[in-house]
Amino acid sequence: MFYSCLKKILFQLDPEHSHEFTFRHLKRITGTPLQFLISQSVPTKSVDCMGLSFKNPLGLAAGLDKNGDCIDVLGAMGFGFIEVGTVTPLPQQGNQKPRLFRVTEAEALINRMGFNNLGVDYLINNIKRSRFGGVLGINIGKNKETPLEVSKEDYLICMDKVYPYAGYIAVNISSPNTEKLRQLQYGDLLEDMLTSVKKKQTQLHEQHDRYVPVAVKISPDLSEEELIKLADAFLKHEIDGVIATNTTLDHSLIQGLNHCQQSGGLSGRPLQPSSNETIRLLSKELKGRIPIIGVGGIDSLMAAREKIAAGASLLQLYSGLIFQGPALIKKIIHHI
């Protein structure tokens, strides 16, 4: 009831202003006793995945708390894990505004944010102050000005810095909003990226005497043949997990709706079919050897169960939280 009233107010604002307003106030209470105002009691439903123990299988997807400003207060909502970022080596403003749009009729969002963030060092300072007891994933990417051919260097810089603080590291090579980034999912660029990331992971494991799993986040807009090649590459390089999926450039399911012509990645309910199919095909190829984190359009208990049936071991929310509120977290965890 409270969130329904709050949503009516927030949805009167521009989506990005609404996000900034919400996070400005959440930041004030994160890590303070006032967190009880939005904290929720959820049952423990432990899941072992990627060598980690998760209190429950539901997490927050990357993109909502890019800079780690509100880790503790978001954790108090009941998430078993939180993924912050996408973060880049240097701060950057992202793409020109407006760049975030609500497709309210479809409970969907379109964004072309472009990895706007305050940089990896700012994120780490926030993580150091956090007392979140769940698993913390850190999603990393490249700066806009870094040429694609040397983009792996940005990922390696971020890995170096976040490794001591991460439960797992998510390598984002699938955002549609950084020019040519998705090319990193193919051919020699993919091979070079995976080789470099695994080599760096081995070095950091030895340096810190602690193994931090690496997951790769992929697009829902891949053909079956492309997915098979990706799966083969992940198996070859012994990647620890796959996050499926990022947002889609296919807007066909929202034709005729408000903002449907806006460019950018579509998330929310219309993403469910392609995300589920990607997970199903990927699961078939990986044969249980690499776990899948399912994300894309989870807005109900049924949608969560469909992701698990398709082959996901863990789940993540983003748009569903915006449209349904924290009650969705509690409902899914209680009944999953």
UniProtKB/Swiss-Prot annotation:
Catalyzed reactions per annotation: (S)-dihydroorotate + a quinone = orotate + a quinol
Record's keyword terms, sorted: Cell membrane, Flavoprotein, FMN, Membrane, Oxidoreductase, Pyrimidine biosynthesis
Compartments in which it is found: Cell membrane
Quaternary assembly: Monomer.
GO biological process: 'de novo' pyrimidine nucleobase biosynthetic process; 'de novo' UMP biosynthetic process
Protein's UniProt name: Dihydroorotate dehydrogenase (quinone)
Any one cellular-component term (Gene Ontology): cytoplasm
Cofactor binding annotation: Binds 1 FMN per subunit.
Gene responsible for this protein: pyrD
Binding positions (substrate): K66, N111, R112, M113, G114, F115, N172, N177, N246, T247
